[in-house]
Amino acid sequence: GALNRRPDWEPLMPAINEAIRRYGDRLYFRVISDHGFYEELRTEAKAFAGGMRDASIVAPYEHYTAALHASDIALLPLRDTEFNRAKSDLKFIESAGHGAVALASPTVYAGTVRDGETGLIYHSPEEFAEKLDLLIQRADLRRTLAENAYRYVAEHRLLDQHLDEYIAAYREMFARREEFEQDRRRRVEEFFPKL
């Protein structure tokens, strides 16, 4: 879950509600912080933690990770927008670390999720519906994808495996701090000329 994601998930809601209609009690939803998403689910088999429609309250992180850990599937929809393309793949990393299979959009996640190996990528609401159906029906596939994703994170994405890269990046930023500050000031003047 996240706040203000209606444009990302709204095109998928008919497929989600159709899965609810087809599978009934086999499905249980844990929604974090997005009350709009929670309200659109046509089932009573759902739980909500944190977040209000106006985004004034955010669920504690431990509620988010507990929900991931208790889930089989994590829905990771992001429309292809400039804002979303600037996001990281952290939700995939968190999902994989807690054993939930990612059903993700290609925006952000296509660079990390290996479709059919460490999760599933969809390119349309129709493909989302097909892949959601597949994940619901196939416990063996969910288990294999979750294990592969967990192994990928353990082998490639832990912080201690990249410390030298992080240190080098921070040293470079520190060395270029005056250049960055000049760029920042130029952007402030451009976007806020009366400031």
Per-range role (PLM):
Residues 1-70:
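Conserved catalytic-core segment of nucleotide-activated headgroup transferases in glycan assembly
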Residues 3-4, 87, 120, 154:
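Glycosyltransferase donor-binding loop in the core domain
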Residues 7, 58-68, 72-97, 103-113:
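Nucleotide-sugar-dependent
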Residues 15, 91-92, 166:
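Short amphipathic alpha-helix
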Residues 115-126, 134-140:
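Conserved acidic donor-binding segment of nucleotide-sugar-dependent glycosyltransferases
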Residues 128-131, 141, 145, 158-166:
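Hydrophobic alpha-helical packing elements
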Residues 150-156, 160-195:
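C-terminal amphipathic helix plus adjacent low-complexity
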